[in-house]
Amino acid sequence: MSGAGVAAGTRPPSSPTPGSRRRRQRPSVGVQSLRPQSPQLRQSDPQKRNLDLEKSLQFLQQQHSEMLAKLHEEIEHLKRENKDLHYKLIMNQTSQKKDGPSGNHLSRASAPLGARWVCINGVWVEPGGPSPARLKEGSSRTHRPGGKRGRLAGGSADTVRSPADSLSMSSFQSVKSISNSGKARPQPGSFNKQDSKADVSQKADLEEEPLLHNSKLDKVPGVQGQARKEKAEASNAGAACMGNSQHQGRQMGAGAHPPMILPLPLRKPTTLRQCEVLIRELWNTNLLQTQELRHLKSLLEGSQRPQAAPEEASFPRDQEATHFPKVSTKSLSKKCLSPPVAERAILPALKQTPKNNFAERQKRLQAMQKRRLHRSVL
């Protein structure tokens, strides 16, 4: 009991029970254990963040470079297609200018006058029955003089052609003619005339053909698919021609020489270091320009100063002599001032002698003036 009492007497007043003592010791141990670990955690967190940021930057740079490479490939592919289409457009215009009036006349003459005929595979056929012999002979005479006359539904009798077929054939013939003639292209000044003539001939043919096709297309189911295909091809060819002409106009307006483009292996994404180098170079050039401007200003000021100096020196000495006493009278004493009136009036008496003349008087006056000036300066 006495030992327990002594132990109880030694306890601090703030811990009446042993349970509270244990609770206070536990957090102290935890705090002591956490104190040495806190700087390690602080050091590890920024390192992890730096690694994650570097990985994300590398991934973004790779994506950026891949996207740039793909875009440049697409641009080159589109440029090649545009050049091909532009070449085809020019050759079609030249071929239409040469063979335009004769082809239009033949196509109009070969078409029958009645609205009951339908064109199947390039041959005009009546939907209810076989075609007459006149159409056979007319088609063979006009378009195929050396061929057979008994064919109706075959692909050999090409009496009327669709616009897409005519474009393809004319482009093929034009390529042959240019390869034989040494790739001689027409001048750009003649493109406008060719465009106007070709547009007029194409509009006349396209306006006549749909009227004849649409009259009996609903009755013949086999012809609808071919007509739709021909329309789609014609529309695609027209759109391509229009796009090429617009692109040609833009190129001619912008300039004859295209902009210089680096090849793909030399194109690399810009980095922060490159940007910093560029900024430093621009800053240095700016400083050099400012220094040059200051130097030029100083030269201009120096060239203007000697011009003002001779102007000041060109003033007469009489004015300096007259202005000098006025300025000096402020700082001089009374003794240095001009002499009184009595001294001025005192002059030697004139004697009636032959030596007295005007020259002597003038010399005396000059001597008096010199003395006065000497006194005023002192």
Swiss-Prot record:
Spell out the Basic and acidic residues composition-biased ranges. 194-205, 314-323
Question: What are the alphabetically sorted keywords of the record?
Answer: Coiled coil
Q: Compositional bias (Polar residues) at which positions?
A: 34-44, 165-182
Task: Name the segments for region: Disordered.
Answer: 1-52, 128-211, 301-328
Q: Which residues form a coiled coil?
A: 47-90
**Basic residues bias spans:** 141-151
Q: What InterPro entries has UniProt attached to this entry?
A: CCDC74_C (IPR029422), CCDC74A/CCDC74B/CCDC92 (IPR040370), CCDC92/74_N (IPR039496)
Q: Which PANTHER family match?
A: COILED-COIL DOMAIN-CONTAINING 74A, COILED-COIL DOMAIN-CONTAINING PROTEIN 74A-RELATED
Q: What is this protein called?
A: Coiled-coil domain-containing protein 74A
For this protein's source organism, the top of the classification is: Eukaryota, Metazoa, Chordata, Craniata, Vertebrata
